[in-house]
A protein has these predicted regions:
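Cell-envelope/extracellular polymer assembly enzymes that use nucleotide-activated donors
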Residues: 9-11, 42, 176
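Short, well-formed alpha-helical segments that are part of the catalytic scaffolds
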Residues: 19-34
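A conserved acidic beta->alpha catalytic loop
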Residues: 29, 47-55, 96
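Short beta-strand/loop segment that forms part of the nucleotide-sugar
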Residues: 39-49
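Acidic donor-binding/catalytic loop of UDP-sugar-dependent glycosyltransferases
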Residues: 53, 94-108, 179
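Glycine-rich, basic loop-to-helix element that forms the pyrophosphate-binding segment
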Residues: 68-84
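Short aromatic/hydrophobic "clamp" motif used to bind/position activated sugar donors
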Residues: 89
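Conserved donor NDP-sugar-binding/catalytic core segment of glycosyltransferases
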Residues: 100-130
Length: 243
C-alpha cells in the first residue's frame, strides 16, 4: 500500500477464510482509496483455516498475513487488529470493498476528538425485493441499539481499552463491539459516528447461497443469530459454509 519507509497512518484489518476469489477486490479497493487520500495505508489479513490461495493473493497485493485458525470470528478479527501497526484501524470483511473516498473519510472522523470511532453505511452489491425484506428483518436488532457496523474504524488505543472483540460470542461480535465502543466513548464525552457518504459495498453471497428471502422467511434463525451464543445457528449460517 505504501513505501516500506513510510509509516502507515491507517491499518485495515481483514479476517479471511478461503477468500481467494474475493480478497483481491477488497485489497485493491483499499489501495485505490488510499491513493485518493494520498495517505500510506497498511493491510493486515488474518488467515483462518485457509486451504486455498488466499495468502498468495493477499501477499501479492502487498498485504501482511498472520494466521489464526480459531473457529471463532471474534478471535480472528482480534488477531488481525492486534497485528496492525498504525494508530488508527479499520476492520473490513474480505467480501466487501471501499469507495474511493472511504480512507479519507475514516481519517477525518477517527482523528476528530469528539468521536470515539464508529461504523459505516453498507450497500449490498445488488438489490431485490427479497433482499430488501431480509434486510428489514435484521434492521430492528441493529437500529434499536443505535449503532452502525459493516466497517469499524477507531484508534488502536480505544480497541485495546475495551478489550477488542468478545471471543465468547460466536456471532454478532460486531454489534457487541460497537455497543462497547459507543459506551466507552460516552463515558469520555465522545460520540459514536457513522460514515454515510463514503460507505462500503458488500457481496450478496449469503443471499446467492441461501436465497434472497431466506432471512425474512426464517425469523427464528435471525433471532438465534443475534443472541450471539447460539452455536448451532452460527455454524449453519457462518462457520460450516464451504467456499
Amino acid at each position: 500500500m505504501s513505501a516500506a519507509s513510510t509509516a502507515p497512518v491507517l491499518s485495515v484489518a481483514i479476517p479471511a477464510h478461503n477468500e481467494e476469489h474475493c480478497i483481491a477486490r477488497c485489497i485493491e479497493s483499499i489501495a485505490a482509496s488510499a491513493r485518493t487520500a494520498g495517505q500510506p495505508v497498511e493491510v493486515v489479513v488474518a488467515l483462518n483455516r485457509c486451504t486455498d490461495g488466499t495468502q498468495a493473493v493477499a501477499q501479492a497485493l502487498g498485504a501482511r498475513c498472520v494466521v489464526d485458525d480459531t473457529r471463532c470470528i471474534a478471535a480472528v478479527r482480534n488477531a488481525a487488529v492486534r497485528a496492525t501497526s498504525a494508530p488508527a484501524v479499520a476492520t473490513l470483511d474480505a467480501d466487501s470493498w471501499m469507495a474511493p473516498g472511504t480512507v479519507a473519510a475514516i481519517l477525518m472522523h477517527v482523528n476528530d476528538p469528539r468521536t470515539i470511532g464508529g461504523g459505516t453505511v453498507i450497500w449490498p452489491e445488488r438489490m431485490s425485493i427479497g433482499i430488501f425484506f431480509s434486510l428489514l428483518s435484521i434492521a430492528p436488532y441493529v437500529i434499536r441499539r443505535g449503532v452502525s457496523a459493516g466497517m469499524f474504524w477507531f484508534l488502536r488505543e480505544s480497541f485495546d481499552a475495551i478489550g477488542g472483540f468478545d471471543e465468547s460470542l460466536v456471532s454478532v461480535e460486531d454489534v457487541d463491539f460497537a455497543l462497547r465502543l459507543k459506551a466507552f466513548g460516552r463515558a469520555r464525552g465522545q460520540k459514536y459516528g457513522t460514515i454515510r457518504r463514503h460507505g462500503i459495498t458488500t457481496s450478496c453471497r449469503k443471499f446467492d447461497q441461501f436465497g434472497d428471502w431466506y432471512l425474512f422467511r426464517n425469523p427464528r434463525l435471525v433471532k438465534a443469530i443475534f443472541e450471539g451464543t447460539n452455536q448451532r445457528a452460527a455454524e449453519g449460517f457462518y462457520y460450516d459454509i464451504e467456499r
